[in-house]
Amino acid sequence: MSYIPYVVEKTARGERSYDIYSRLLKDRIIMLSGEVNDAVASSIVAQMLFLEAEDPEKDIYFYINSPGGVVTAGMAIYDTMNYIRPDVATICVGQAASMGAFLLSSGAKGKRYALPHARIMIHQPLGGAQGQATDIAIQAKEILRMKEELNAILAKNCSQSIKKVEKDTDRDNFMSAEESKEYGMIDEVLLKKSKE
């Protein structure tokens, strides 16, 4: 069981207690901490839709610390990021691996960041197949289709050729924050938060 801190906010009307994630949501901050799965994706999609309804013009800040996860769940988040009107700024804290890295690169151009000691890792989609030979063939065909789709999007996000992305994702490919900037995954390594 994970521990979720609570914060107490004092207002003219008295005190109010929030779990930390609800409090961050008030500031248009969404956290992805851990594996990308259907439950996590549903929560993140709902938060993005809520923030769009609150103010379609203000940016959303999407902090990512994830080892990756289920491709279809990640694509639900990706499609929502592109569907909603606000820009989604992405910030890697800790790690963005696999689908986490894909989502990091999918933030609004010019608004994709990583902290200095973050690790970013890209690779091809993982999958396993069992069952009858024809079912395994169907699953193999689908994972190859997904691989092509993900590589095409990643190539566009990073301004790289599809051939380069195919080569670079053939095996686990780890990058530092600075290397991921050179690759085009992010736009800037954040050293200190601005005092705006």
Swiss-Prot record:
Pfam family membership, one: CLP_protease
Record GO terms (molecular function): ATP-dependent peptidase activity; ATPase binding; serine-type endopeptidase activity
UniProt key word Hydrolase: yes
Main localization, broad class: cytoplasm
Family: Belongs to the peptidase S14 family.
General function of this protein: Cleaves peptides in various proteins in a process that requires ATP hydrolysis. Has a chymotrypsin-like activity. Plays a major role in the degradation of misfolded proteins.
Protein name from the UniProt record: ATP-dependent Clp protease proteolytic subunit
Annotated organism of origin: Sulfurimonas denitrificans (strain ATCC 33889 / DSM 1251)
